[in-house]
């Protein structure tokens, strides 16, 4: 008689209550170790590794080419699905716990992998996957990768420059949009296109 239970809403309520009431424990290593660990990538995997290693007392430095911590949590997932503040408070917890972030640092271009190996006792590679699988279909000139579209939309939402959005290439306003796929990423594209004012949005799914 009480209707459905929205698990996501319950989990969010519990999590928000924990943060508000101070139940989320700070990172406090039981022992400080002298060994340093370099982590390449500040996305979900890199952040998880940083927390686990720092909790065990290692000195952790996370390198990322972007200017914000979070990877696809920040740039790939729309704000209506995951608020950026959720990622930012996790980042602050890591910083308060002693994790160091080196942002705008492109490994290989700005610092060599050999230098990282020489600087740290170990290096964790947590770069994620940003390259899309091409469709390779005839006349695919108007096809854009979902991640490119979502990243541009997120950058606009963050107040960053997004040339491909400004030029109209990755702006769905007044466009007839077709999204191929029916997974989470496809739904993010559908909802983003609608919010941008697309003339129509059609989802093709097998």
List PLM regions with ranges:
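Charged, alpha-helix-enriched surfaces in structured cytosolic catalytic cores
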Residues: 5
